[in-house]
């Protein structure tokens, strides 16, 4: 968890200055996109929301214990507009910054997140590890951005639309190669090329309006999951990062993660699903 502590220290030490997501991601040894994704899965809130809560917590402390004007505190925590600071402050505390100066006012304090590994009698995670060759996928896609908070909202809308299209039926007809099923895949190539695919693993020609992508050969840890879509899949990712990965002897490979939704005979997606996450063996310290 060394890198986790370092990136957390970076955020806490820069609440009153500019926080670079790129620099935080470098500390975490991954892309900005994957860093935000990992943070959200582990903590349950977006990185942007966490930073906002921490800054507003510190701002409230300063307003109550010092004689600083509201504008001074707003500027310190990166808000050049009193209106935007007032809005952010009220979203966290439910009252205005001026009202917060009253000693009797009730405020919300969000402490810094402390990452640790807890030993519990929790439920088992069913998994197996497989080495697979290169995988070619074909399907439809929608662009994503580096802001994971925005993507969380846009991907479900993309699913809802795609399920009603002829293209989805074509994708279902391609689901004969491993991993068998309709695949949901986030693919990060660079900050300007991030896409979410609804696709299938296939050798078929690419139909008009669809795209192909090849995922290189790698080792996968595969988790089985009996829930439906977003809530259950995100739970698998959270447990992967917090419960499985720290003790496994592996590290995250940084390749696209795959959600696998098997298709039943009537062409609908079944509730049982799998999550495929690319991993690699940790380098031993010498």
Question: Which residues are covered by each model-predicted region?
Answer:
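Core residues of bacterial helix-turn-helix
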Residues: 28, 77-78
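Short hydrophobic/aromatic patch on the recognition helix
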Residues: 35, 39, 84-85, 89
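Short, small-residue-biased leader/transition segments that mark boundaries at the very start
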Residues: 1-5
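Structural motif
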Residues: 128-143, 213-226
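Short coil turns linking two alpha-helices in DNA-binding domains
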Residues: 31-34, 80-81
